[in-house]
Amino acid sequence: SNTHLLNLVPDDRIKITILAGEYLPSIGSIAGSLTERLLNDMFFDKAFIGASGCSAKAGINTFDIREAAKKRIVHDNSNESFVLIDSTKFGTSTLFKALELNECALITDQYHELLASARSYQVAEPGEAPRAKGAGAAAAP
């Protein structure tokens, strides 16, 4: 949940739901035990999850344990989940693992050898629709 995006919504007819919890100003997010309790009762068709890093050992990871727990719950409560991660974060291990690579569908901007360990992946190139790759690849969302 990136609270900075709230200022970018141009249409006041768009409904936005914000979960309660602890505000984390360094990453513009809301997380913590209250957020986790609310998310445990929510279910999603599709989820798009961000990450601070991606490595073979640390999987999809983040600097904050509350963020890692939130990502895990959203992933587990979604019919489909996609991790959005730019290529600069490959090979990066931050403090807390959120997800294993083999349980993730990754969407990124450049190919990296770690993508072969993902459940599926898509490389989105500027100006063209992403193409699914890997075992069990999902169609472009």
Task: Put a short name on every predicted segment.
Residues 4-136, 141:
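Conserved phosphate- and dinucleotide-binding cores of soluble alpha/beta proteins
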